[in-house]
Amino acid sequence: MAQDLKIAATANLTCALKALVKEFQKEHPKDAISISFNSSGKLYAQIIQNAPFDLFISADITRPKKLYDEKITPFKEEAYAKGVLVLWSENLKIDSLEILKDPKIKRIAMANPKLAPYGKASMEVLDHLKLTPGLKSKIIYGASISQAHQFVATKNAQIGFGALSLMDKRDKNLSYFIIDKALYNPIEQALITTKNGANNPLAKVFKDFLFSPKARAIFKEYGYIVD
């Protein structure tokens, strides 16, 4: 019996989740999986409004946990990976965070800290380095991490805070620097089965697959930290 699965996924998973679905469908070729990518905050807001998702794969633990704590879903949140923050550019060489202080840098992209955990982590880095007051006017915010990436990719921003998982290793112009994990709180990413997903057997099958050795290897390949 072919089944349908609707997933709400954080934008930093745009590349990795497509690879994971491709792998999953080798064993489940008849099942249809549709994914809505957005910031964790926006997806959370849609789920509270009863959006018909079966699984919510977030960039934080807070929002999935809230869904359980507020009894919006009977399932508990499960951490699946830790995200890695980078500073990157499409045409400038980046080998340290010193470039943030360069007066030639006029626009810095990051995800909206209120909606996206990677944006929150980016602000923590600037706060930690005491650079926030001086750089505030240069920051342009993307609604999600992938929109912040677009700003850099289209050169609307010279540099940006991004997710290691979205870095295209084949792009020869791209340069990125992995930010010291001591500068931001861990980006612990969790998922949760929604109330809708309770009636969809495929939700459990796909969720279990995400914790399989095969899936863990794919997460690693895309730069996530998996224990």
Q: For each predicted feature, which ranges?
A:
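Exported/periplasmic ABC-transporter solute-binding proteins
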Residues: 2-27, 32, 36-37, 41, ...
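Active-site acidic carboxylates
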Residues: 76-78
